[in-house]
Swiss-Prot record:
It comes from Sulfurisphaera tokodaii (strain DSM 16993 / JCM 10545 / NBRC 100140 / 7). The lineage of its organism: Archaea, Thermoproteota, Thermoprotei, Sulfolobales, Sulfolobaceae. Keywords: ATP-binding, Cytoplasm, Ligase, Nucleotide-binding, Purine biosynthesis. One of its GO terms (biological process) is adenine biosynthetic process. Signal peptide: none annotated. It catalyses: 2-formamido-N(1)-(5-O-phospho-beta-D-ribosyl)acetamidine + ATP = 5-amino-1-(5-phospho-beta-D-ribosyl)imidazole + ADP + phosphate + H(+). The gene is purM. Pathway: Purine metabolism; IMP biosynthesis via de novo pathway; 5-amino-1-(5-phospho-D-ribosyl)imidazole from N(2)-formyl-N(1)-(5-phospho-D-ribosyl)glycinamide: step 2/2. This is Phosphoribosylformylglycinamidine cyclo-ligase. GO terms for cellular component: cytosol. One of its GO terms (molecular function) is phosphoribosylamine-glycine ligase activity. Its main location: cytoplasm.
Amino acid sequence: MVSEYKKAGVDLNKLKEYHTLALNTFQNSGVLKIGHYANAIKLDDKYLAMHVDGVGTKTILALKTGIIEPTGIDCIAMNVNDLVCIGARPLAGVDYLALEKPMDDVVEKVMKGLKQGADEANIEIIGGETAIMPGVITGYDLSCSVIGISDRLKTGEDVAPGDVILGLKSNGVHSNGYSLIRKLIDEGKLSLNDWGEELMRPTRIYSSSIIPILDKIKALAHITGGAFSKLKRITNYRINLKMPDPPEVFKAIENAGVPHFEMYKIFNMGIGMIIFVSKDLKDDIIEFLSKKETVYELGYVEKGEGIKITTYKNEILYI
């Protein structure tokens, strides 16, 4: 059965093939295996980490709604949140903005968003590239590269049965699944007038909340493309999750024609970051994170394999 995401033009299996090609081409190019949230090289007694990511097709909705600034925040968030997942503290970044034609208003608002995101993440934007490329770009494309530093990388190897899994509330859809969302809008199944403002909410920046307690955390997973299937990166043990009731925008997307289980393979469903912690540190970590974040106790790690998700409809999904 063809997934709704593939019908929208995003073939996750093909992306896996491309990841494998990159892995085979650039093997042994970093400390971690290519395909993790980020990678790093050894630099004296520390690790220099680097990550690149973009906003994707959310920019198309940005132009349609006129809500541009959040995409600048998205660009920062997608990078710093992934860097912190390998135990790195983000330091600085550069941006790449490609335009179909001169767009003064877009450039100004993107830069404001980038500045706001950088301030929230406590990083500096130290350079970038702006290009006008008619015939190559339609609208605009936005991406960033961010570097970070770490004394000890987090690979997930410390995760063990009995560990507790926490979830941090998302700010909405964030920056993934927009090709499918646009398809639903184009087909008249989802109203941009009703949901445009909600769909343009920026990706939440978690790094500044997490960094002060990074040494107490065993592993982290930023819920982006591939959604909860990416938890397989963290551990080979069985992951058990009971998901909370998601924000209404996800129910609207599901009601527009996306199968219930597929929602958890594409969207964050209200949880933007997952954190693995020791049971004895759980309460202290929840207390600290709750100062800035909405924290859910989602589940636990046990012996076995795979991912078991109890959805908000109390249906069981195995990944």
